[in-house]
Amino acid sequence: MKITVITLFPPSHVAGIIAGDGTLSGGHIQGIAPQAFIVSVRVLDAHGKGRLSAMLEGIRWLKENGKRLGIQIVNISVGSVKKQKENSQLVKAVESLWDSGLVICSAAGNEGMQQHNITSPGISRKIITVGSCDDKEMIDEGGRFYHNYSGRGPTIACICKPEIVAPGTNIVATNAMKGKMTALIQ
């Protein structure tokens, strides 16, 4: 399985959570898909800052090259801080990837305690949005538990988000080892 991680350089902690093979821990700490092949698409700078144009370029690159590389899943662990609508350029671009047959997972964002604060592109009704659920201050909203910083829905368009919540704090994962990266697409 090939998974794309839209990330900053070097490949992020998220790549280790997904595909860490446990080599340095003697197999004790592995990602959820240790046999996965990661394709990292750089859309943020070394400080974690980015522009919409870089995200759109990364998505365009995936659309043009994803099938050739056998990519099946795209993980987007970045999001906008501004409230965007479902018809925004970013949401439309991500939905076009979904429509091309890729599974898209996106972070719910870190905008916190109130409703209607899922960040884009997680507001899309097509993609899978993931929130965090593990804080000392767990919040129960109708049987759905959220971390106090995790973005939560429903979206402004009344789409129930996130679809999935999982641990999101103090997660142990691997780092990319020098010489172990197959390729970096910038």
Sequence positions of predicted segments:
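Short beta-alpha junctions and helix-cap segments that line functional grooves
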Residues: 26-28, 90-94, 114-118, 149-151
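Hydrolase catalytic cores
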Residues: 15-18, 39, 43-45, 74, ...
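Short acidic, glycine-rich surface-loop motifs adjacent to enzyme active sites
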Residues: 38, 59-85, 107
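Glycine-rich, charge-decorated loop segments at or immediately adjacent to ligand/cofactor-binding or catalytic sites
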Residues: 110-126
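Solvent-exposed loop/turn segments at secondary-structure junctions
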Residues: 24, 44-47, 80-83, 110-114, ...
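Catalytic-core regions built around general acid/base machinery
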Residues: 89-104
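Subtilisin-like serine protease catalytic core
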Residues: 1-53, 67-72, 123-126, 154-161
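Extracellular S/T/G-rich loop segment that most often corresponds to the catalytic His/Ser-adjacent loop
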Residues: 122-186
